[in-house]
């Protein structure tokens, strides 16, 4: 369709397959290719049944085609995307990176969605980042946040080989995002793979140090406003209870602190609802891809009219 941007999904695992279902519903993006390296991949088989062109010969195959996609969504691993990113750029393909490679600027929709719509490569940070950085941002836009710490607890069953291979990059990339996008002066990220059966829904705890005389009501309202914004693309994102304000103590390092508890229930497109950590990643990536497509199509239409 002329009014949709063509898309290739690189990677054929859990995240890529869930992403495919979201992209198929998009009014702005048309998934046409799925690329993997395993010929027996369930993701490739599903994509074929849904009418996509598939290959297990990787990025080499995709870039050798006579028709190239307008946009690539990559959900492989950090080191794979680092190698492929310059090749996408050379071919003029916009890249949305769902690995922790962080080749391009990180994007968390409530915080900085519109800042990087013209970037050739954008990074979706991490699942923990997508769930928690909006809360740090909600606090830091009201008061100074000298330190923020996030703890993401996800079901072990939702963490495939790619997630496990990227654990070190996860903590580095998320910590950097807490600072650079969330607005904290210092940030720390911790991920817990919870082995409980039946699998637990994704839960996140966000600690933000705040000034002594901070306006608690303004912080609480800002948090609720950002939660509502995230819910426009992840309906299962919710506060578990009211933000909690604590006086300085030995436990919190002598800081005045606000603590936010959220949980993320997935939409159940391909992954089970407990895998909210993966669902928020694919939903946020779809949101960013759609905004890039809208901007690009609007610019094209404007140029044609001129």
From Swiss-Prot:
GO terms for biological process: catabolic process. Gene3D superfamilies: Dihydrodipicolinate Reductase, domain 2 (3.30.360.10), NAD(P)-binding Rossmann-like Domain (3.40.50.720). The keyword Signal does not apply. The active site is at 127 (acyl-thioester intermediate). One of its GO terms (molecular function) is acetaldehyde dehydrogenase (acetylating) activity. It is an enzyme of class 1 (oxidoreductase). CDD domains: ALDH_C. It holds the Pfam family AcetDehyd-dimer. Its EC number is 1.2.1.10. Keywords: Aromatic hydrocarbons catabolism, NAD, Oxidoreductase. SUPFAM superfamilies: Glyceraldehyde-3-phosphate dehydrogenase-like, C-terminal domain (SSF55347), NAD(P)-binding Rossmann-fold domains (SSF51735). NAD(+) binds at residues 12-15, 158-166, 277. HAMAP family: Ac_ald_DH_ac. Belongs to the acetaldehyde dehydrogenase family. This is Acetaldehyde dehydrogenase 3. It comes from Mycolicibacterium vanbaalenii (strain DSM 7251 / JCM 13017 / BCRC 16820 / KCTC 9966 / NRRL B-24157 / PYR-1) (Mycobacterium vanbaalenii).
């Amino acid at each position: 369709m002329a009014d949709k941007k063509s898309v290739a999904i690189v990677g054929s695992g859990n995240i890529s397959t869930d992403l495919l279902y979201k992209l198929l519903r998009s009014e702005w993006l048309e998934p046409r290719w799925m690329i993997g390296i395993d010929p027996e991949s369930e993701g490739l088989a599903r994509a074929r049944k849904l009418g996509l062109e598939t290959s297990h010969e990787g990025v080499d195959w995709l870039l050798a085609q006579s028709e190239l996609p307008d946009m690539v969504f990559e959900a492989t691993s950090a080191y794979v995307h680092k190698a492929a990113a310059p090749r996408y750029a050379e071919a003029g393909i916009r890249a949305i990176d769902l690995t922790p490679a962080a080749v391009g600027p990180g994007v968390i929709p409530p915080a900085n969605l519109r800042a990087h719509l013209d970037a050739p490569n954008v990074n979706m940070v991490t699942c923990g980042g997508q769930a928690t950085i909006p809360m740090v941002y909600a606090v830091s836009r009201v008061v100074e946040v000298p330190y923020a710490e996030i703890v993401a607890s996800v079901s072990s069953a939702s963490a495939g080989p790619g997630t496990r291979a990227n654990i070190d990059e996860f903590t580095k990339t998320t910590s950097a995002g807490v600072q650079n996008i969330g607005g904290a002066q210092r940030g720390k990220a911790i991920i817990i793979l919870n082995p409980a059966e039946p699998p637990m829904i994704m839960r996140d705890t966000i600690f933000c140090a705040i000034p002594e005389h901070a306006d608690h009501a303004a912080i609480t309202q800002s948090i609720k406003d950002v939660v509502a914004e995230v819910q426009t693309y992840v309906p299962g994102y919710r506060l578990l209870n009211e933000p909690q304000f604590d006086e300085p103590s030995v436990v919190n390092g002598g800081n005045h602190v606000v603590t936010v508890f959220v949980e993320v229930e997935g939409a159940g497109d391909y992954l089970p609802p407990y895998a909210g950590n993966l669902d928020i990643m694919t939903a946020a990536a779809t949101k960013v891809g759609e905004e890039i497509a809208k901007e690009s199509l609007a610019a094209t239409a404007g140029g044609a009219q001129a």
